[in-house]
Amino acid sequence: MSRPIEFKTILLACLIISVGQLSMGLVFPSLPWIAKDFDISLDQAQLLVSVYLLGFGPSQFIYGPVSDALGRKKVLLAGLLIAMLGLLMIIFLSHTFTGMVAGRFLQGLGTGCCAVLARASTRDRFNGPELPVALSYIAMAASITPLVAPVIGGFINAHFGWTMVFISLLGYVLLAWTVIVFRFQETITQTSAMPSPKKMLLQYRDLLTSRYFMSFASIGWLNFSLMITTVSVMPFIMQNQIGMTSDQYAMWALIPAFGMICGTSICNRVRPIIGTKKMLLVTPILHVSSAAWLFFCPVEPLYLMLGQLLMILGNAIALPCAQAMVMQPYKKQAGAAAAMSGGGQMVVSSIVSMALVQLGLSQAWHLSLVIVVFATITLTNVLRGFATEQPSEQ
């Protein structure tokens, strides 16, 4: 009989990964008010998002290998201290936009540790069939947080002003830091010397040239990209083409969020019975069904959300299964593997979503064609990944 899974470890990982997601999503609704207060354009206010991502994305590639050498807890605490320093800069320099931009970059630089080390510490703790279950909860937290964060941020901004958004973030990061100090137990048993830049680059080169790693990592990258693209396009369809207000859309958007919870629950219950490969093969089926629905359905809220629900169900199954397959062979280099997986996810999703928007993706049937292409690539990578021999323990 298998031992019960350690939910305390999973909850800690979910708390850690939510810090980075909240730090981005909570600020979105405040941008128009920040632009108005500083008498700048909305495009200029978007710089607060861009510089955050500039710090958040690349820093992951450093945190991963460093935590493999020095341990997860020290690196987490140091990263969150940097994030709090950035937030203090934003709060106390809120009278100058330049000061806020500098603070946001520092905040992103600090919170870059969260996604990497949440996954790496989970890989340290769990093995075998427990790993996909644990990672499914983390994937759910990472996916739902960006959906609910703008709703929370909009409420805080509407009732207390945009400065309170950053004060709330500071409080949340401080809470996470305190919990880690007292509750997080180091998951690395042996520390080593700090890796040189050359060694880091060699580790990433080995991962990028691994057919196994790239097959499963790209499944996660493309599924996350599909979610980000849909989140960007669907508000335009619902608000501009249907005439829905942002408050109304926020309520409808809870349906896809519910789909993420359902998909994760289905994955956790069915995967141990049919296996990871068959579970992953369900994703292209759900995505093609979603594409067909969105292509033919009327442009009405309920129909559009049901189509997105089918897509999200596929994402909720693919993300934890692919992440588990990515991390499985890399116990001693879990930080580097998590960094490449998570950092690559950020890079690919940014490029893909921007490229599709630039190509004029603005209709539901446009989205359906994109989903079909992504489903085909996912199917190819699933078959290729399982046909490739798993790398030996690193």
Describe the residue ranges of each PLM region.
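Paired small-residue
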Residues: 86, 98-106, 302-310
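Juxtamembrane intracellular "pre-TM" segments in multi-pass secondary transporters
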Residues: 1-3, 185-216
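C-terminal transmembrane helical hairpin of 12-TM major facilitator-type secondary transporters
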Residues: 277-322
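Cytoplasmic helix-loop-helix junction between adjacent transmembrane helices
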Residues: 103-144
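Helix-to-loop junctions at the C-terminal end of transmembrane segments
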Residues: 60-71, 263-276
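Conserved MFS/SLC helix-loop-helix module at the cytosolic interface between two early adjacent transmembrane helices
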Residues: 58-96
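C-terminal membrane-cytosol helix-exit motif in multi-pass small-molecule transporters
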Residues: 171-190, 381-382
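A late C-terminal transmembrane helix in Major Facilitator Superfamily
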Residues: 327-361, 370-371
